[in-house]
UniProtKB/Swiss-Prot annotation:
Protein name in the entry: Beta-glucosidase A
One GO term (biological process): cellulose catabolic process
Pathway: Glycan metabolism; cellulose degradation
Organism of this sequence: Acetivibrio thermocellus (strain ATCC 27405 / DSM 1237 / JCM 9322 / NBRC 103400 / NCIMB 10682 / NRRL B-4536 / VPI 7372)
Gene it is expressed from: bglA
Keyword rRNA processing listed: no
UniProt record similarity statement: Belongs to the glycosyl hydrolase 1 family.
Length: 448
């Protein structure tokens, strides 16, 4: 097989999120987040796990940066815990929380690692949830206030910014299915939440521009390609609708200033029509510097008149594929097709893959190594498709591998390992897996 080489300025990174790695949930003045409350409620998280300690990154960030340097990570994408900065979501600033992120950012820079900050990765201050959370439009203003503090303190040294991580997951899993914090199960609420998340993105981008910050800003969506189960018109239409609800519902407002028609029509049929000031979409769709997405898998969709939405997963197709430990199918071509779709339908934007990776059951072997060959194969296959898209003219600028560390995988607790670095959750000892050493070579050679 011929060698695959990426463009010379391609950014090789890895990613984490505050609640999944930091621990120190009640230290140095940090306020309670909705994930603290949710994980402390029995029955919400597998095995009663919580993020109270997680990887203890809050106390071990120096060691973690050493590991990044050893692997050769060029850029590290991390999120800031809003309740560390504003324990009540608004009002009194917690200087100790801010100082932690300043130390972290400066140490990354000293080690030649480019910091990339996500402003919101799901850990809303509980005090704001008590006032209605993301369903309450006021939260978008509190978010702007919080963003301003971060921009003021880190804007001149951080080159890459993400407003939100996966608003679709916050809306769907947090407010419709109720399996993520804050555990609400209501369709109308989930749609109002999705709108307010996007509105807060727009407000933060507007502020970022007004502050003349010399850096790039975008948003990280969760996207997968939705394939029709067959060439029948009804399956094709079902897959298009499914992708509209999960993908275009976020892509279109941000990049086109409107919601997709087929999705609006479906919600109208269910008796739900969103009402909001007409300026909202103008705010939401301000120009961004790149569109980012997290991609792990693909969907196969069939027409299903018995389902509420008129479609369902094509299980007979899905069962043919190899799956990761999350039960997600491994289908690398889906990444290529998704990149081509974004390039074609949204005017050749700059694109960042903000997360990609796989969970497998990793164990330290008798030789002391973690031989995660399945993960290496997964990464190789997905990166091959990313490279293929670049060859075909897609403006893909960066790749952030999920994740640097094994961590708290939300409702699954510590049972799903995504890291290229193994974490023993009893001793908190870190150990680079074979995939970490493989990634080191990829970065060094700018390909494989």
């Amino acid at each position: 097989m011929s060698k695959i080489t990426f463009p010379k300025d391609f950014i090789w990174g890895s990613a984490t999120a505050a609640y999944q790695i930091e621990g120190a949930y009640n230290e140095d003045g940090k306020g309670e987040s909705i994930w603290d409350r949710f994980s402390h409620t029995p029955g919400n998280i597998a095995d009663g796990h919580t993020g109270d300690v997680a990887c203890d990154h809050y106390h071990r960030y120096e060691e973690d940066i050493k590991i990044m340097k050893e692997i050769g990570i060029k850029s590290y994408r991390f999120s800031i815990s809003w309740p560390r900065i504003f324990p009540e979501g608004t009002g009194k600033l917690n200087q100790k929380g801010l100082d932690f992120y300043k130390r972290l950012t400066n140490l990354l820079l000293e080690n030649g690692i480019m910091p990339a900050i996500t402003l919101y990765h799901w850990d809303l201050p509980q005090k704001l949830q008590d006032k209605g959370g993301w369903k309450n439009r006021d939260t978008t203003d509190y978010f702007t206030e919080y963003s301003e503090v971060i921009f003021k303190n880190l804007g001149d040294i951080v080159p890459i910014w993400f407003t939100h991580n996966e608003p679709g997951v916050v809306s769907l899993l947090g407010h419709f299915l109720g399996i993520h914090a804050p555990g609400i199960k209501d369709l109308r609420t989930s749609l109002e939440v999705s709108h307010n998340l996007l509105l807060s993105h727009g407000k933060a981008v507007k502020l970022f521009r007004e502050m003349n910050i010399d850096a790039q800003i975008g948003i990280a969506l969760n996207l997968s390609y939705h394939y029709p189960a067959s060439e029948k018109a009804e399956d094709i239409e079902a897959a298009e609708l499914s992708f509209s609800l999960a993908g275009r519902w976020y892509l279109d407002p941000v990049l086109k200033g409107r919601y997709p028609e087929n999705a609006l029509k479906l919600y109208k049929k269910k008796g739900i029509e969103l009402s909001f000031p007409e300026d909202d979409l103008k705010l939401i769709s301000q120009p961004i510097d790149f569109i980012a997405f997290n991609n792990y898998s693909s969907e196969f969709i069939k027409y299903d008149p018995s389902s509420e939405s008129g479609f369902s997963p094509a299980n007979s197709i899905l069962e043919k594929f190899e799956k990761t430990d999350m039960g997600w199918i491994i289908y690398p071509e889906g990444l290529y097709d998704l990149l081509m779709l974004l390039d074609r339908d949204y005017g050749k934007p700059n694109i960042v893959i903000s997360e990609n990776g796989a969970a497998f059951k990793d164990e330290i072997g008798s030789n002391g190594k973690i031989e995660d060959t399945k993960r290496i194969q997964y990464l190789k296959d997905y990166l091959t498709q990313a490279h293929r898209a670049i060859q075909d003219g897609v403006n893909l600028k960066a790749y952030y591998l999920w994740s640097l560390l094994d961590n708290f995988e939300w409702a699954y607790g510590y049972n799903k390992r995504f890291g290229i670095v193994h974490v023993n959750f009893d001793t908190l000892e870190r150990k680079i897996k074979d995939s970490g050493y493989w990634y080191k070579e990829v970065i060094k050679n700018n390909g494989f």
